């Protein structure tokens, strides 16, 4: 679960 980028 990334926070800065939704595509990572």
Swiss-Prot record:
Disulfide bonds join 2-8. The modification Cysteine amide is found at residue 8. The keyword Hydrolase does not apply. One of its GO terms (molecular function) is toxin activity. It is found in: Secreted. Keywords: Amidation, D-amino acid, Disulfide bond, Hydroxylation, Ion channel impairing toxin, Neurotoxin, Secreted, Toxin. One of its GO terms (cellular component) is extracellular region. Signal peptide: none annotated. The modification D-leucine is found at residue 4. The modification 4-hydroxyproline is found at residue 6. Its main location: secreted. Expressed by the venom duct. Changing residue 3 to P: Permits a very slow conformation equilibrium to occur. Its target is unknown, but this toxin may modulate voltage-activated calcium channels (Cav) or calcium-dependent potassium channels (KCa). The cysteine framework is C-C. Belongs to the O2 superfamily. Contryphan family. Exists in two forms, due to cis-trans isomerization at 5-Tyr-Pro-6. This is Contryphan-In. It comes from Conus inscriptus (Engraved cone).
């Amino acid at each position: 679960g990334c926070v800065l980028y939704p595509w990572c």
